């Protein structure tokens, strides 16, 4: 099974500081981590890979320093990682983000795409469903467990 997991590198919420004037996150000097829901998605993909075989490819859109998250995912056991990076993507909203990621996914072979529920730095929970919309494929949100039985996925919400 060819599994793609979309991940986002986010500020470590234990280190977050806010600009008192703009009420926006101050990201300078704040360590980044793999978004926790996305990390759970990596772990789910790796369990499926272990059970039925296949590959796990990590895809992320972000600045060049997001390669740290990709290297961590590779160390966890992912087979490949792709970083989509360009200054033009800075400040992209969820629709632009999902459109860009979907365009990259169209160039890959996949049987399953896993995205985290939401990113802790935005909490919109929109990118995963929007990727599915751009690709014209079905999606199931808020999945707690995935089982593979032959060509069928059984999911628990």
Predicted regions and their residues:
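N-terminal glycine-rich FAD/FM-binding segment characteristic of electron-transfer flavoproteins
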Residues: 1-157
């Amino acid at each position: 099974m060819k599994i793609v997991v979309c991940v986002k590198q986010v500020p470590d919420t234990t280190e977050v500081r806010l600009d008192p004037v703009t009420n926006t996150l101050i990201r300078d000097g704040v360590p980044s981590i793999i978004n926790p829901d996305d990390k759970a998605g990596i772990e789910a993909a790796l369990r499926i890979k272990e059970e039925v075989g296949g590959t796990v490819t990590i895809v992320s859109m972000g600045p060049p320093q997001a390669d740290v998250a990709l290297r961590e995912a590779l160390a966890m056991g992912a087979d490949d990682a792709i970083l989509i990076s360009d200054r033009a993507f800075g400040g992209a909203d969820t629709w632009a983000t999902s459109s860009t990621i979907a365009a990259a996914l169209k160039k890959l072979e996949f049987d399953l795409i896993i995205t985290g529920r939401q990113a802790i730095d935005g909490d919109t929970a929109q990118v995963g469903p929007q990727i599915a919309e751009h690709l014209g494929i079905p999606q199931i949100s808020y999945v707690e467990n995935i089982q593979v039985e032959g060509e069928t996925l059984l999911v628990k919400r």
